[in-house]
């Protein structure tokens, strides 16, 4: 795996860190399941059927434009049930937060880029994959036939390392 290569290189370069965490660690899996359950209980996750083009090699759905680019191989049309996060419900809140906190996104041209993106309706975010198609990942706490999609659980890793659910004082000092 890659992780030992990084940690070995950091030692040679005299680079120190407070914590090194991987998304495969039990402490991370615990936090992901906890957050997923909270978000589900809040009504921000729902099950729906999705149909689209799927790149088997990339393990993700792609747009028609991406399919036409020739950059993807082994593309198939796929229709399946998955769980979705209601991202669209938070669009106005995101815009307000960014505008109320001028330094939240740096540099300024990136902030403007994000605000421009948020002018178009946000799509809800698919956060799962059926175990029948993807046998690795963190199991959803509310449906054992599904795992969390890696790009959703990877973001949670930041707050796992910051002590969410394990070190309240550390978490409050960092977050």
Annotate each language-model stretch with its function:
Residues 55-57, 68-73:
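Short cysteine-rich clusters marking metal-coordination/redox-active sites
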Residues 43, 59, 135-137:
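Glycine-centered flexibility sites
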Residues 43-51, 61-65:
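Short, flexible, mixed-charge glycine/proline-rich loop motifs
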Residues 51-53, 124:
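Cys/His-enriched microdomains
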Residues 1-47:
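N-terminal Rossmann-like or analogous alpha/beta NTP/dinucleotide-binding catalytic cores
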Residues 27-31, 54-64:
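Short, well-ordered, mixed-charge alpha-helical segments that flank or form enzyme active sites
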Residues 27-31, 70-71, 75-175:
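Structured secondary-structure scaffolds
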